[in-house]
């Protein structure tokens, strides 16, 4: 496989597949980049440490601060304690959350990614019902509907009458 093909394959894989968590996988949030493909992460247990990015992701996928990754711990490291297994996009975060495997310490970040939060529809009420202006009663709505129907009936009567307009496409002019 050429380098361009590998890059295209990894980019498509990250963007189109849902990741299934293994038992030893840890979800972590990227805090900062240390350089040389090393990143400082905060994991679901509250520990902060450095992880490495494998060769397959280098120059193909870019990490940003506060983005979520799946980390697989490695035993042979003093400073580097894990390797990035998968980079989670928004769809994967919501998928893992639906499965019930999303850590509770990152729940606030996952809630911001939901459709309801993006549309501005929150589950909890931010404005009390007492603070809202009073709504119109149903009686007023019934009266306004009757008025609209009366107006509509008057319009129908005028439609039945013939118009005295001249149509140049007719042979004769209308008689008055």
UniProtKB/Swiss-Prot annotation:
Region called Disordered, residue ranges: 117-176
Family: Belongs to the EIF1AD family.
GO cellular component term of the entry, any: nucleus
Highest taxon of the lineage: Eukaryota
Limits of the S1-like domain: 5-89
Name of this chain's protein: Probable RNA-binding protein EIF1AD
Sorted UniProt keywords: RNA-binding
Biased composition (Acidic residues): 129-164
Residue spans of biased composition, Basic and acidic residues class: 117-128
InterPro entries attached to this UniProt entry: EIF1AD, NA-bd_OB-fold, RNA-binding_domain_S1_IF1, TIF_eIF-1A
GO molecular function annotation: RNA binding; translation initiation factor activity
Any single Pfam family the record assigns to this protein: eIF-1a
Biased segments, Polar residues type: 166-176
């Amino acid at each position: 496989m050429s380098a361009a093909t590998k890059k295209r394959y990894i980019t498509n894989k990250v963007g189109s597949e849902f990741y299934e968590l293994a038992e030893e996988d840890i979800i972590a949030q990227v805090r900062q980049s240390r350089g040389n493909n090393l990143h400082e992460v905060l994991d679901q247990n509250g520990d902060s440490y450095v992880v490495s990015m494998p060769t397959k992701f280098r120059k193909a996928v870019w990490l940003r601060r506060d983005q979520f990754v799946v980390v697989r711990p490695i035993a042979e490291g003093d400073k580097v304690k894990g390797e990035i297994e998968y980079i989670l996009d928004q769809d994967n975060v919501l998928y893992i959350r639906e499965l019930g495997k999303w850590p509770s310490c990152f729940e606030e970040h996952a809630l911001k990614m939901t459709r309801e939060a993006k549309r501005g529809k929150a589950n909890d009420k931010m404005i009390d019902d007492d603070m809202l202006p009073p709504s119109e009663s149903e009686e007023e709505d019934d009266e306004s509907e009757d008025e609209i129907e009366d107006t509509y009936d008057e319009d129908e009567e005028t439609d039945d009458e013939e118009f005295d307009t001249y149509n140049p496409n007719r042979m004769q002019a209308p008689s008055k």
